[in-house]
From Swiss-Prot:
Similarity annotation: Belongs to the DnaJ family.
Residues given in the record as Zn(2+) 2 binding sites: C167, C170, C189, C192
Classification of source organism: Bacteria, Pseudomonadati, Pseudomonadota, Alphaproteobacteria, Rickettsiales
Protein name: Chaperone protein DnaJ
Cofactor mode of binding and number, as noted: Binds 2 Zn(2+) ions per monomer.
Organism: Ehrlichia chaffeensis (strain ATCC CRL-10679 / Arkansas)
Gene Ontology CC annotation, any one: cytoplasm
Any Gene Ontology biological process: response to heat
GO MF: ATP binding; heat shock protein binding; unfolded protein binding; zinc ion binding
Gene: dnaJ
């Protein structure tokens, strides 16, 4: 049976760089790895072919021989006579350690029972608080259900003083290997489930796992100035580990409710304040509430325009891990009078008839530009 072209197997061109070859192999190997396809002989064979192709193409000398002689390069009876076995260890854990940083289990002599698989999972909890809670800080009670250490066996999984014995199938390693040609396939030991040990007398409460599901109640301290999306890490408050292994962590994510008055950007607060046309024109003062519960007298400059911003220093939110605060910005919205009486209309008309071009410089200047533009068009 003829072999598939190594480049076609990995889906790369003959000019592919080592990085492109490594990336392509990573993608394909993850798809066909035996651990992801238990009992699938077709996937197992595909994985062998992919690994063989990678081992050749990633090596400069082997690749050169393959490009020149094809598959005959690795057949002692062929023209190239390149000894494939001389450069291949037959243990794919080396390849995967190189590609995935040791992410695949089963390095030589490694013990499954000590790897990260037994560690409890991290958990996430979302809380919703008010802007005032974020300003003042708060202690929030939370409750959730997860795996906790078994109180009967203290997490050991054993009943009473019973001890664990070494698994006779994997000899305490936690995984077993089978040789197929010059390929080594490594799988988790099915007898001890990768623990390397077997409990002779399992705890009745937790069935030997060392953990049970229960409700956890905590009081979480919310720091001053926390923002939406910030997370608080509580070490060891996640899921309990398997048979006394380290517990995961709990991450509490905050979500700040929408405020009826303020909007927030980092440590700064913003609010839109409508004011009368007369106040904007003549100037004056307004009373403004702050997030800290106090009131501040704010000066509105004479001739204030719609959209102008007034800044109140250090009237915003606390800055985390600092004694300082952000600022508060007041954006002015000049309100046009509506439902005027006859007298009010007459007064406004009288005001508008006053020959003072300086009181509305923007609109006066704009319409002068319009007249000039129109005059130029007509003259052309």
């Amino acid at each position: 049976m003829s072999k598939s072209d190594y480049y076609d197997l990995l889906g790369v061109s003959k000019s592919a760089t080592p990085e492109e070859i490594k990336k392509a192999y990573r993608k394909m190997a993850l798809k066909y790895h035996p651990d992801k396809n238990p009992g699938n002989k077709e996937a197992e064979e595909k994985f062998k072919e992919l690994s063989e192709a990678y081992d050749v193409l990633i090596d400069q000398d082997k690749r050169a021989a393959y490009d020149k002689y094809g598959h005959n390069a690795f057949d002692s009876s062929g023209r190239g006579g390149f000894d494939f076995n001389s450069g291949f260890s037959g243990d794919f854990s080396d390849i995967f350690n190189d590609l995935f940083g040791g992410g695949f289990r089963g390095g030589r002599g490694s013990s499954r029972r000590h790897d990260s698989g037994a560690v409890g999972s991290d958990l996430r909890f979302d809380i919703e608080i008010t802007l005032e809670d974020s300003f003042n800080g708060k202690k929030v009670p939370i409750s959730y259900v997860t795996y906790v250490k078994c109180s009967s066996c203290s997490g050991s999984g054993s009943e009473g003083s019973a001890k664990s014995v070494q698994c006779s199938t994997c000899h305490g390693v936690g995984n077993v290997r089978t040789q197929q040609g010059f390929f080594t396939i490594e799988r988790t030991c099915h007898v001890c489930n990768g623990e390397g040990e077997i409990i002779q007398n399992k705890c009745k409460k937790c069935s030997g796992s060392g953990r049970v599901r229960d409700e956890v109640n905590l009081l979480v301290t919310i720091p001053k100035g926390i923002e939406s999306g910030n997370k608080i890490r509580l070490n060891g408050k996640g899921e309990a580990g398997y048979r006394g292994a380290r517990s995961g962590d709990l991450y509490v994510y905050s979500n700040i409710q929408k405020h009826k008055f303020f909007t927030r950007n980092g440590s700064d607060l913003y609010c839109n304040v409508p004011i009368k046309m007369t106040l904007a024109a003549l100037g004056g003062h307004i009373e403004m509430p702050s997030i800290d519960g106090t009131w501040t007298k704010v000066k509105v400059p004479e001739g204030s325009q719609n959209g102008d911003k007034l800044r109140l220093k250090e009237k915003g939110m606390p800055i985390i891990n600092s004694s300082k605060r952000g600022d508060m910005y007041i954006q002015i919205t000049v309100e046009t009078p509506v439902k005027l009486t006859k007298k009010q209309k007459e007064l406004l008309q009288k005001f508008d008839d006053e020959p003072n071009v300086d009181c509305n410089p923007q609109s006066t200047g704009f319409f002068q530009k319009v007249k000039s533009f129109w005059k130029d068009i007509r003259s052309n």
